[in-house]
């Protein structure tokens, strides 16, 4: 009888271990929606052709030590076109391009590698995986069948290099589930005691929502370190961005005849 009880106990523990293991690798699908705001530019006719928001389908692939956040297989690129009143200036902002946005997090080494592109040039931004100062509350909801807990923190966005602007603060609200016991989440939002399924930034100006959780897919080939682009630090990338945007502004202000630009927001 004792032997039978021992076998039953071993069987229960084994099943529990298998179930727990199954919760530490898989894929979470998300939708991202960002409300768009444009500063008025004299002579540039934004009119009704500008969308009120931009959306994207994303996927988070993960195991116990790694997470990769990138475009979902069904993601469709969007282009935004702007034209001056006299037709002498045209600009196209493209969400697609030669370099896909990929955020690779090494959870064990606490390192991050972000592959992105701007104006046709590719970059690999290397940084430490910094832990946000989350405040975990007692508030709970059920989402996609998971019990989720609310966490909040204030995100500080530094000013553009060389500008007189002040830092901008944005409140971030996240809902994470301890039922998926990994510090993962969409985009930069993670480092909580469970996977983040919902994110709201700046009172809903950006919203990220999980649409499905899949523990059955083989995600081995997705957990690959991105390699495209020039390796830069976050500060170096911000400096490059500032210089390129200044160049665009000068070209627009000093334009002669017809000018056009294509900006790839990869």
Range-by-range predicted roles:
Residues 23-266:
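Extended soluble regions of mature proteins
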